[in-house]
Swiss-Prot record:
<keyword id="KW-0233">DNA recombination</keyword>
<feature type="domain" description="SSB">
    <location>
        <begin position="6"/>
        <end position="111"/>
    </location>
</feature>
<dbReference type="Pfam" id="PF00436">
    <property type="entry name" value="SSB"/>
</dbReference>
<comment type="subunit">
    <text>Homotetramer.</text>
</comment>
<dbReference type="InterPro" id="IPR000424">
    <property type="entry name" value="Primosome_PriB/ssb"/>
</dbReference>
<dbReference type="GO" id="GO:0006260">
    <property type="term" value="P:DNA replication"/>
</dbReference>
<keyword id="KW-0227">DNA damage</keyword>
<dbReference type="GO" id="GO:0009295">
    <property type="term" value="C:nucleoid"/>
</dbReference>
<feature type="DNA-binding region">
    <location>
        <begin position="55"/>
        <end position="61"/>
    </location>
</feature>
<keyword id="KW-0234">DNA repair</keyword>
<dbReference type="GO" id="GO:0006281">
    <property type="term" value="P:DNA repair"/>
</dbReference>
<protein>
    <recommendedName>
        <fullName>Single-stranded DNA-binding protein</fullName>
    </recommendedName>
</protein>
<keyword id="KW-0238">DNA-binding</keyword>
<dbReference type="InterPro" id="IPR011344">
    <property type="entry name" value="ssDNA-bd"/>
</dbReference>
<dbReference type="GO" id="GO:0006310">
    <property type="term" value="P:DNA recombination"/>
</dbReference>
<dbReference type="GO" id="GO:0003697">
    <property type="term" value="F:single-stranded DNA binding"/>
</dbReference>
<feature type="compositionally biased region" description="Low complexity">
    <location>
        <begin position="132"/>
        <end position="160"/>
    </location>
</feature>
Length: 174
């Protein structure tokens, strides 16, 4: 069996700016995001904390792009699952340039993290319901083209009955 390889990127980070939304001639939406991922560690020699931030270009297509444009803002925390692609383009002087991006297409995922509360730039009540009290919900997940699975609900506890507990103290050996 020949292996075809795997091209899958998973990122959790914060948006560096509001998404840039454009529409293709076919009418499909395209969202461009800049996503920051950070890692921190303690320097073994000096003992001081160090931090490194990587910036990722993310391109989202279709309905997910429209959702990103509507709900994501600078600073939003988001989970992205897509594929790495490098495209070639020419700058104004005709020089070949390359850009590597995480592409979220059919089968990709964008999940908003970090909850809804406390955001200064969130719409007020009546504009999408973001300010209205709701059941606790930490994230919203959207999959590009893939059928989304309903969130699993915790199993309900059995209703208490009025019967006394069963006494299994019998002498049956099996």
């Amino acid at each position: 069996m020949a292996s075809r390889g795997v091209n899958k990127v998973i990122l959790i980070g914060n948006l560096g700016q509001d998404p840039e939304i454009r529409y293709m001639p076919s009418g499909g939406a395209v969202a461009n995001l800049t996503l920051a991922t950070s890692e921190s560690w303690r320097d073994k020699q000096t003992g001081e904390m160090k931090e490194k931030t990587e910036w990722h270009r993310v391109v989202i297509f279709g309905k997910l792009a429209e959702i990103a444009g509507e709900y994501l803002r600078k600073g939003s925390q988001v989970y992205i699952e897509g594929q790495l692609q490098t495209r070639k383009w020419q700058d104004q002087s005709g020089q070949d340039r390359y850009s590597t991006e995480v592409v979220v297409n059919i089968g990709g995922t964008m999940q908003m993290l970090g909850g809804r509360g406390g955001q200064d730039n969130a719409p007020s009540q009546g504009q999408g319901g973001w300010g209205q009290p709701q059941q606790p919900q930490a994230s919203q997940q959207f999959s590009g083209g893939a059928p989304s699975r309903p969130a699993q609900q915790p199993a309900a506890a059995p209703a208490p009955s009025n019967e006394p507990p069963m006494d299994f103290d019998d002498d049956i050996p099996f």
